[in-house]
Structures are given as C-alpha cells and as structure tokens.
Regions:
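A glycine-rich, hydrophobic loop/mini-helix early in the fold
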Residues: 32-64
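Acidic, metal-coordinating catalytic segment for phosphate/diphosphate chemistry
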Residues: 1-34, 38-40
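A short, polar/proline- and glycine-enriched secondary-structure boundary/capping micro-motif
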Residues: 25-27, 55-60, 133
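Short loop segments at secondary-structure junctions
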Residues: 10, 39-42, 50, 114-119, ...
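The catalytic Nudix box helix
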Residues: 45-46, 63-96
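Short, solvent-exposed loop/turn elements at beta->coil junctions and helix N-caps
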Residues: 20-24, 96-102
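Nudix hydrolase/Nudix homology domain
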Residues: 58, 99-181
Length: 181
C-alpha cells in the first residue's frame, strides 16, 4: 500500500496521508514529480509505458513521472522514481524544480536535468516501462500528432525544451530551441 502526504493549497503539510488510488479530498493536495532528462544534443530521454499499465498505457512519455511517497520531498521522490523506473542514480541534492504545475489535487514539480545514458543499458522497471530512448523536440511533437505520445500541449513541450536550452523561463537572443533539420 503506497501512502502519500497531503498538503493544503499553500503547500503546508497537513499531517495527513492518503492511499494511492483513493480520491484526493477537496482542499487537499499531494506531490507529483516529473523528470525530463536531456543529453548534450538537446534530446530528451523518453519512456514507453507498458501496455498493461493503468493510465496512458502503451504510450510514450517524457523521461518519467510519479507521486512522492510519505516522508519524501520532491527531490527524494524524484531520485527514487528515477532509480525505480529506469535504474538511473542521479544526485538531486542541490536540484530545484524548473517549474511547478498546480492542478486539481496535485502540486506537480518538473525537474529538467542533464544526463548521458545509453538507453540500451537502462534497467527499466517491468511493471512500468517497456523501453526508453532519446528523442528530439520535433520528433516528440510528431509522436503527439501520431497519437503515440501522451497528448501534452505542444506549447508545453516547446517550453520544456526552451527552458532546458536557455536555463530559464525567459528567452535569450543567443539561444534557441534545438529543432531537427
């Protein structure tokens, strides 16, 4: 049984937990983390979700996403999820989320990180992930169009790539999103 800590709308702990799969009570929130790992070519590591997984089964997704468990913060939850799902031990000690999405019942922290991994050597968690590979910005947008990638807003994918390329939410004239030719 997986337990999640609950927070109020200002992200203050409520000293309450909920069981994964239960409905989030009105006025309470739990933490979710997403990680986008980018390589030196500006490609994102993407994962293919298992066909039997609940929610977005048999679809491609960003590097990973998952809920933090009781006693974890976003950094420790991101570390655990990355180790569990892909077998990558990444040091999140000094990491901060690049952005937080506030959605009904959740605070969703997105980490944009560097990584040079060979997808063929990853230890994908068989209950969650069937495979992983690198993909560029334009390829991910095409995969969304083809209905094989979770249907994120394309402008959101644009923003993730731009934020990684610039290291900021603000554009800089000397840095552009790496589109394939």
């Amino acid at each position: 049984m997986e337990l999640w800590d609950l927070y109020d709308r200002d992200r203050k702990p409520l000293d309450k937990t909920m069981v994964r799969g239960d409905e989030v009570a009105p006025g309470t929130y739990h933490d979710v983390v997403h990680i986008c790992m980018f390589n030196h070519k500006g490609e994102m590591l993407i994962q293919h979700r298992q066909p039997f997984k609940d929610g977005w089964s048999d679809m491609w997704d960003i590097t990973l996403g998952g809920s933090t468990q009781t006693g974890e913060n976003s950094r420790t939850g991101a570390h655990r999820e990355l180790c569990e799902e892909l077998g990558i031990d990444y040091d999140f000690t000094n990491a901060r989320p690049a952005l937080t999405i506030n959605a009904p019942g959740i605070f969703d922290d997105f980490f944009l990180i560097d990584g040079e991994v060979d997808p063929g050597t990853l230890r994908c968690q068989p209950e969650e992930v069937s495979e992983a590979r690198w993909a560029g910005h334009d390829e991910i947008l095409s995969m969304i169009d083809d209905g094989i990638f979770i249907p994120y807003h394309k402008c959101f994918i644009d923003m993730l790539f731009a934020m990684y390329a610039t290291g900021s939410m603000r554009s800089r004239p000397d840095t552009t999103v790496p589109h394939e030719k």
